[in-house]
Amino acid sequence: MARMHTRRRGSSGSDKPVADDPPEWSDIDADAIEERVVELAEQGHEPSQIGMKLRDEGVKGTPIPDVKLATDKKVTTILEEHNAKPELPEDLRNLMERAIRLRRHVDENGQDMQNKRALQNTESKIRRLASYYRGDELDEDFTYSFEVAVELLEAEEA
């Protein structure tokens, strides 16, 4: 698949192995995994970071290669059930952080055309994602602007 704002090809990667059951060596109880997921979320980790920590560190020393196979739930579903879900979806939040950084850079360096273009592309991605999440994760009348992004991220950190 191609990249969104360039003519280059996307990067290919290996596929996840097809498996219906977790490996025998990873026999941790699903409740213990859920507790660890909530604990990591309360420490401020995002869902993707939680998955990597469980893969690398595991629960009680045993790595968890795939949370969904071990618990039959995604990390975000577990967080929803325990009311630890972040206010903004992770991908949208990361794009907003990037747009804020770029906007502040472009305000200081008005001659930087490459980063002006990068800001335009990032804001386009945000608007596209916002239309996807609108109504479910975001308010029905949500429209992106720099001020709204700053306000949302400051409210989330507080």
From Swiss-Prot:
- Sequence ranges of Basic residues compositional bias: 1-10
Q: Which GO terms describe its molecular function?
A: small ribosomal subunit rRNA binding; structural constituent of ribosome
Any single GO CC term annotated in Swiss-Prot or TrEMBL for this entry: cytosolic small ribosomal subunit
Species:
Haloquadratum walsbyi (strain DSM 16790 / HBSQ001)
Q: Where is the composition biased (Acidic residues)?
A: 21-32
Q: What is the official name of this protein in its record?
A: Small ribosomal subunit protein uS15
Q: Which family does it belong to?
A: Belongs to the universal ribosomal protein uS15 family.
Which processes are annotated in GO (biological process)?
translation
Q: Compositional bias of type Basic and acidic residues: which residue ranges?
A: 33-45
Q: Where is this region: Disordered?
A: 1-66
Q: Which InterPro entries match?
A: Ribosomal_uS15 (IPR000589), Ribosomal_uS15_arc_euk (IPR023029), Ribosomal_uS15_N (IPR012606), uS15_NS1_RNA-bd_sf (IPR009068)
Q: How does it assemble?
A: Part of the 30S ribosomal subunit.
- Keywords tagged on the record: Ribonucleoprotein, Ribosomal protein
UniProt cross-references to HAMAP family, sorted A to Z:
Ribosomal_uS15_A
Give the gene that encodes this protein: rps15
Q: Point out the signal peptide segment.
A: none
Q: Does the keyword tRNA processing apply?
A: no
- PANTHER family with a match to the protein in the record: RIBOSOMAL PROTEIN S15P/S13E, SMALL RIBOSOMAL SUBUNIT PROTEIN US15
